Amino acid sequence: MHRFFKSEFFNFEFIRILSAAPYGGAEIAECLVAAGQITNDDPESWHRAWIIQADKAKALGDEALHSGDTVSARRAYLRASNYYRASGYMFHDRPGAPDARVLPLAQQVLDTYALTLPLLDTGEASQLKIPFENYQLAAYLYLPRDRTKPVPVLLSLGGADSIQEELYYVYAASGPQLGYAVLTFEGPGQGITLRRDKMHMRPDWEVVVGRVLDFLTAYMQQNPSVQLDLSRVAVVGASMGGYYALRAAVDPRIGACVSIDPFYDMWDFVRNHVSPALLNAWNAGWVPSRVVNGIMSMAMAASFQAKWEVGLAMWFFGVDSPTQTLRHMMKYTLARADGTSRLDQVKCPVLVSGATQSLYLEPESDVLRVFDALAHLGDERREIWIARSPEEGGLQAKIGAIGLVVQRTFRFLDQHLNVTR
């Protein structure tokens, strides 16, 4: 496949932005101009290139709205929101390495995206606040315009580095047109809850989704006109969001689960990136944490991708050293302490996918392990999809093949939620 950047990381993230083009989140020429202004592995040039395009798109949206052209305004605001997201993507704002630009850029994404909501032509959209412990989780509910009968609900979960405004370009842009209500939200360690509220990540996503389902039940009782069919609720997520979807699927209120390119155990991911011998020696107490921290710090200094990945994990876990990050990663697994799998509690149908050209994961050690742990469902209620080439979904999270993953997801959900058109 054609490459735009020498860096695998920058190339992947650029394709990620391009992937939003069919759904209004990018314009090809704008992206190519931005690419020409970006220096490989230079986060500042990445930021500058995308902020320029974001400001231009925002101005075009304002101009179109002023003249009464709501179609062009919607398209421009969607692009601006995505470009603002991209402009801040390479930055972190953790206590040990603060960056004052992170929160204002996140707010620009929110403010610009809010301008699109009344202009969307794919259905109705509203902003919600979901009570969770001592916080309010930001959420969007997208509804089909035709709700003469109750509609199934899809919970679209973000992952480690996505924000829910970006999730629009995947399922929220298509779901309402196919007769589904789609709910997105940002849980602990995600999006604005991390940047503004300083909520850090947690592995037990069944608890988070459980609160969301409780909220939807109360919301439906208070707003019956939304016509949500809470007997037909599905969950979908990609990468870490795929792990979250599998954790959520243990809730008996979930009627179907789609897990796109998940990991089974985050520690396996670590072992693929750091010497297993070093990790084993450190974990056994033979090598002190300061030595591992020093080695990982040198790796971060030598590679921007490593610096970004470790820095992101330190940020969303709320820790200040690489070894503390490793300790937290051990908690993110589908295995119980006794060696059994949490997936034995899943009773709903599950579609799980893998990507052989993933930037991060190995299908053989992750997706097949997930699929095998779902054997109790039988072949009628579990499905596996391992994609090999980019156009077939071979990149992580099916980046570059959004239309295909949307098609396969809703085909699976239609079948198992008894949706007919």
From Swiss-Prot:
Description of the deletion phenotype: Impairs the productin of oxaleimides and leads to the accumulation of a trans-decalin containing alcohol intermediate.
This enzyme's EC code(s): 3.7.1.-
GO molecular function annotations of the record: hydrolase activity
Keyword annotations: Hydrolase
Active site: 239 (nucleophile)
GO biological process, one term: monocarboxylic acid biosynthetic process
Recorded superkingdom: Eukaryota
Induction text: Expression is positively regulated by the oxaleimides biosynthesis cluster-specific transcription factor poxB.
InterPro entries: AB_hydrolase_fold, FrsA-like, FrsA_esterase
Pathway as given in its UniProt record: Secondary metabolite biosynthesis
Described purpose of this protein according to its UniProt entry: Hydrolyase; part of the gene cluster that mediates the biosynthesis of oxaleimides, cytotoxic compounds containing an unusual disubstituted succinimide moiety. The first step of the pathway is provided by the HR-PKS poxF that serves in a new mode of collaborative biosynthesis with the PKS-NRPS poxE, by providing the olefin containing amino acid substrate via the synthesis of an ACP-bound dec-4-enoate.
Assembly, per entry: Homodimer.
PANTHER family the record matches: ALPHA_BETA HYDROLASE PSOB, DIENELACTONE HYDROLASE DOMAIN-CONTAINING PROTEIN-RELATED
The family this protein is said to belong to: Belongs to the AB hydrolase superfamily. FUS2 hydrolase family.
Protein name: Hydrolyase poxO
The gene coding this protein: poxO
